[in-house]
Amino acid sequence: MANGADRLDLDGKPIKPMTICMIGAGGFIGSHLCEKLMTETPHKVLALDVYNDKIKHLLEPDTVQWAGRIQFHRINIKHDSRLEGLIKMADLTINLAAICTPADYNTRPLDTIYSNFIDALPVVKYCSENNKRLIHFSTCEVYGKTIGSFLPKDHPLRQDPEFYVLKEDISPCIFGSIEKQRWSYACAKQLIERLVYAEGAENGLEFTIVRPFNWIGPRMDFIPGIDGPSEGVPRVLACFSNNLLRREPLKLVDGGESQRTFIYIKDAIEAVLLMIENPERANGHIFNVGNPNNEVTVRQLAEMMTEVYAKVSGETAIESPTIDVSSKEFYGEGYDDSDKRIPDMTIINRQLGWNPKTSLWDLLESTLTYQHTTYAEAIKKATSKPVAS
């Protein structure tokens, strides 16, 4: 751990140790952020979540150098009177809690809206009323569809970055019809962003809003039937990983034509740490955090993951590595999607001097090595069990 006195912010000022209330600390992003804070900073973390499986390695040993700097509080923020007290104890609150799995957006729209808007309201309220700084995690989905997606497919302007690159302070938020309940998540996230922004404008709340663009890496989501429900449908990286581990074809929804950018979780966490430790540069800003250099179609992602997994596992790919399925078949009625999600990086580069570093191949190799090491044997055991007669 670096000594607090030795650490300077981007303007050369000493970084003072702080206490951080992290809501959703036991999830994918939270676990990596907790690791970063424990190993590289003197800050304390009040880790709030329902589960702590992904941060147990930070909590159990009493002899580690950060013993006493991280406390786990088992809390469901929907109904727990301790929440305001924990926010009061901290200098900064980071809210990571959310339902953020596309398979849930149109099959569990009420839970999605409540989780991402209603349940977040007290967090914003307590931070504002107690003059506590807030870093709120939103999503790139608030942008919805690109302007270019409404042009004919062969229209030359579809290739103009002005029609598809997403800018925090300029790009409109364009959603589908109400019947397309897939947008329940994006709409709830946009509304809580507007509330946070309004609290800043009217009541002086110090805030930063983060819009992640497909952060991927170890510990993302779950593998169905191993450390998650058998019928569960995780996000694309874990979904494809599950198929590869089970030697099943990777399912490409609507042909896998949607384009996405992917960023390594460790790169993204570097950006978040800069926001935490440079409040004068981060307050009042919305930041895209993604890697525009790692743009691929979902089909290309599947092909690359198949190739990388063959390398890390030593197994040859199956004869038909992908299969096309309709969005209705995969996600159910009411699904819709955005064609491209390419972040503009101007604001985060100007304010924090941050740029992502890890190539798509390297981040997939690191992540799939973890997936294979962690899950391959468990899946073999699960699939080799005799069926009861």
Swiss-Prot record:
Instruction: Indicate the transmembrane segments per the record.
Output: none
Expression by tissue, per the entry, reads: Widely expressed with stronger expression in dark-grown seedlings, leaves and stems, and lower levels in flowers, siliques, pistils, pollen and roots.
Compartments where found: Cytoplasm
Keywords, in A-Z order? Cell wall biogenesis/degradation, Cytoplasm, Lyase, NAD
> What's the name of the protein?
UDP-D-apiose/UDP-D-xylose synthase 2
In this chain, NAD(+) is annotated as bound at 28-29, 49, 76-77, 96, 185, 189, 215, 235
Q: What class of enzyme is it?
A: lyase
**Which Pfam families did the record assign?**
Epimerase
**Organism of derivation:** Arabidopsis thaliana
- What terms describe the molecular function in GO for this protein? identical protein binding; protein heterodimerization activity; protein homodimerization activity; UDP-D-apiose synthase activity
Described purpose of this protein according to its UniProt entry: Together with AXS1, catalyzes the conversion of UDP-D-glucuronate into a mixture of UDP-D-apiose (UDP-Api) as the main product and UDP-D-xylose to a lesser extent, via a cycle of oxidation and reduction. D-Apiose (3-C-hydroxymethyl-d-erythrose) is the only plant cell wall monosaccharide with a branched carbon skeleton and is found in rhamnogalacturonan II (RG-II), apiogalacturonan, and several apioglycosides.
Quaternary state and partners of this protein? Answer: Homodimer and heterodimer with AXS1.
| Cofactor(s) required, per the database record | NAD(+)
Gene Ontology BP annotations: cell wall organization; rhamnogalacturonan II metabolic process; UDP-D-apiose biosynthetic process
Alphabetical list of SUPFAM superfamilies matching this protein: NAD(P)-binding Rossmann-fold domains (SSF51735)
GO CC terms in record: apoplast; cytoplasm; cytosol; extracellular region
Q: Which domain of life is it from?
A: Eukaryota
For UDP-alpha-D-glucuronate, which residues are the binding ones?
105, 139, 141, 182, 185, 214, 251, 253, 260, 331, 335, 337, 341
Task: Tell me what gene encodes this.
Answer: AXS2
Q: Where is the active site?
A: 185 (proton acceptor)
